[in-house]
Amino acid sequence: MFKKVENKVHFPQLEEKILQFWNDNKIFEKSMKQREGCEEFTFYDGPPFATGLPHFGHFVPNTIKDIIPRYQTMKGKHVKRYFGWDTHGLPVEYEVEKSLKLSGRYEIEQYGIDKFNEECRNIVLRYTKEWKKIITRLGRWVDFENNYKTMDLTFMESVWWVFKTLYNKGLIYESYYVLPYSPKLATPLSNFEVNLGEYKEIHDPSLTIKFKIKDKNEYLLAWTTTPWTLPTNLGIAVGKDIDYSKVLDQEKNEIYIIGTKRLNHYYQDENKYVIIEQFKGEHLKGIEYEPLFDYFVNQRNKGAFKIHTAEYVTTDDGTGIVHIAPFGEEDYQILKKNTQTDMITPIDAECKFTSEVKDFEGLFVKDADNKIIEKLKSMNLLFKRENYLHRYPFCYRTNSPLIYRPISSWFVNIEKIKEKLIRSNEQINWIPEHLKKGRFGKWLENARDWAISRNRFWGNPIPIWKCSKTGNKICIGSREELEKLSGQKIIDLHKDKIDKITWPSKYGGTYVRTSEVLDCWFESGSMPYASKHYPFKDKDKFQNIFPADFIAEGLDQTRGWFYTLTILGTALFEKTAFKNVIVNGLVLSSDGKKMSKSLKNYTDPIQIINTFGADALRLYLIMSPVIKADDLKYSDDGVKDVLKNIIIPIWNAYSFFITYAIIDKFTPNNHVNLYKTNILDKWIISEIESLKQILNEEIDKYNLTKSIDVLLTFIDKLNNWYIRRSRRRFWKSENDNDKTDAYETLYYTLKNLMLMLAPFIPFLTEEIYQNLKTKNEKESIHLNDYPQSIKELINIELEEKMNFTRKVITIARALRASHNIKIRKPIKTIYIITKNHKEQNTLREMTEIILEEINAKEIKIKSNEEELVTYKAKANFKELGSKLGTNMKSVALAITKLSNEDILEIINGNKHTITINNNTYDITLKDIILERHERKNLKVINEDSITIGLDTLITEELYLEGLSRELIRKVQNLRKESNFNVTDRIILYTNNDEILTKIINNFENYIKTETLAITIEINNKKALKTLELDEEISVNIGIEKCLN
């Protein structure tokens, strides 16, 4: 019936065999087919870019994305799993720019947008084969053939529908705004894209500049850390309620205005200045000053070069006075509110100064800093130069500094729907839960309008056409609309194709498309609709699969995909786009740093799989903090430990069963009688039924951490308790009912455990199932239903009793170990002290098990410790000090002289009276500090409410019995070294040794039974090995297979 199982197995090879089995027999396809027509479970797969290979950061969510759909499929649901590709956007363009050696927008336009886009199309799916191979090798089942791509015509058309729907709801607008801008990509980024990048600590020049007040020989000392913005200075800001001082600089003989609190930063010596006047910032409002440069003097008549008050000004650093230019968001808002100045942005697409700033024309703004400083110095307007260390955002694609600049952009009005977004978040089950109100919730509360346009080429074009004469806008939501208006057939919606599409306006001009493309995050956020070509296809079915039941991605997506899904789902349908989400953390290198190919600080994940297996890697990842959105410091040894401590023990349990089942020709019956009489059988059956109940509850709640914890706890119970304690039931030669019960119980347990583990470790469970399944069972473990609990088999009382028994045994074994008393050495007595009568009854019921596990001859169950310890007492000064006053010393001395009986009286809740100088004092338990002293030959340990004592006095009989057990262990090792089968009978040879003779005379039958020895012969001529039984005794023994 069963195939023989090797004890040693190479798990990666086994997994390759299982992959072949799944592929040859189309098991994934069959799992999908058999659930057609069943309840739909909707899962969205966030689209990765295929311009790079998958790394550890992808392995975590892809493991989660496999576990949940496998589980839900086994629960009878139909779970469609389509892989998707993010094919547009900055990552793709940046790769093409590098490969074509192009730099910046101008060179791309010179190269040709049509050719550039074609190159993007060619490389965008560069690594799809590698992705498929690696994700499949991880064990993930997903449909790669019916994938979606954001560059597909149908996908792009649905994105246009999303855009137009928002446009018609008044949620899309065009405006100038200060945005983070990537000079290398020549495009603005959204605020959440900035958070996807890195903030680095950089040194920038910190300048204090002299601004001359108009018509006065007085200067404002203003502070900036962005010298390159000074040529576009249009105003100065002060704090309305901040105190300012007008001072005379004694050395320079000039008058300066500065924040009073900042004087000591600029003047360490108070004798170097004289305070002329002090006032609030409100006093300065509206005062005019002379511009630093003459580039934009024409803006004075529009309100430029005046002092404004602003709440963001502080005296924490600088001078308490800041310069205003249109390159800061707060600055821009002040200018917009208080002036009519033009939008001054004298920099090009690559952030180089234009001819408007003639002195620095052609210089990249950050490179112009030093030249601007030199210019100001020559004009005697530089008061002080320092260096300023601060955190600054870098582009998440080019790793270069971002520049904040005003730019015309298209926005989604988040402010209008913010309250609805917060309500949508309430509908989401976040794992871990703290993200709902924490990272994601706070992000929503502070969300700004979303800049969705990019000044790029390879993306989904913004579907707005403007009249060249009137500026009138038409928003297009489908190909059909565009075809009707233009009279042209539309087969591609990319920029290089549709920018050529125009039509005459009834106002006399021409309708021309706005030049920008959509942020690729708008596309991935549209994935629920666009991947289904909604609303152009199967519109009536869509509401049945929206919102998604489940999604999973990394923590960074709280400000990425999770965010855009929530925005668009709320804006379109006023509900969230997903109900449940598992969020994983970052996988870092073992030193806590970001994994980096250049640093070579991690092992290639495929090499890990080829060494330890995908099951071991999957388990390692989902057992780690990364599953709870925390960071994981990855370690190869961690995966190795999972193989050693979990995968191999599962295999060993399976191997043990198969080995003896083959010997005894055990044939499983699908209708096993589960109502057993053996307490171990009843216990493990109850445990596995409880496990089924807990797992179904926890995985239904997406709590993989708890799920894996209870699974691993059960595996430990199965291996280290049930199988270990049941071994003799399988070893014995006779086939009685107890042996049959043991086989049936272990078979049932193993098979059900494999079914429960199947979504987590799909390879190992498949291999074991293939050998355990009976003739008429499902072809694959993954075609089965997930096990449901048989509640009448759950015996909570028995589980509690066994758990308590194991706890007592664990404490007692720890006590033996702490005193170097080997478990094979028997002891006379174990004392167990507990006042709990229920626990005492359990101990009596489990006496046989406890004696075997502790290797003791008798057990004494008591309510108090008198037989184990004697007591001494000391005064509890903290308690007694306030009561005793001057008699404290005398009472404390009397307490140290209390007898053991006196102290016992106090322990039992009585008062003990001490008389000092005719004064009586009633001493209670809280007045003393107890000291326990072990009685002779006893070792005692106390944990929680349990005290355990071991009688360590070893008689000769106990000593010999311990040696007999050591002898048995040595013989068993010899059997293994000789590669004997577990059923092979042997002849045991010994020399004529006095101690050995004593051992054999006392324990011959026991030794024969345990080692399968037919006879024990004294034969000095045989090749014997010298082996140590303990530190002082060595014996010579040998074994030979019995051929009869």
Swiss-Prot record:
Primary localization: cytoplasm
Cofactor(s) the protein requires to work: Zn(2+)
Subunit structure: Monomer.
A Gene Ontology biological process term: isoleucyl-tRNA aminoacylation
Superkingdom of origin organism: Bacteria
GO cellular component: cytoplasm
SUPFAM superfamilies xref list: Anticodon-binding domain of a subclass of class I aminoacyl-tRNA synthetases, Nucleotidylyl transferase, ValRS/IleRS/LeuRS editing domain
Enzyme class label: ligase
Domain remark from Swiss-Prot or TrEMBL: IleRS has two distinct active sites: one for aminoacylation and one for editing. The misactivated valine is translocated from the active site to the editing site, which sterically excludes the correctly activated isoleucine. The single editing site contains two valyl binding pockets, one specific for each substrate (Val-AMP or Val-tRNA(Ile)).
InterPro entries with a match to the protein in the record: aa-tRNA-synth_Ia, Anticodon_Ile_ABEc, Ile-tRNA-ligase, Ile-tRNA-ligase_type2, M/V/L/I-tRNA-synth_anticd-bd, Rossmann-like_a/b/a_fold, tRNAsynth_Ia_anticodon-bd, Val/Leu/Ile-tRNA-synth_edit
CDD domains named among the record's database cross-references: Anticodon_Ia_Ile_ABEc (cd07961), IleRS_core (cd00818)
Protein name: Isoleucine--tRNA ligase
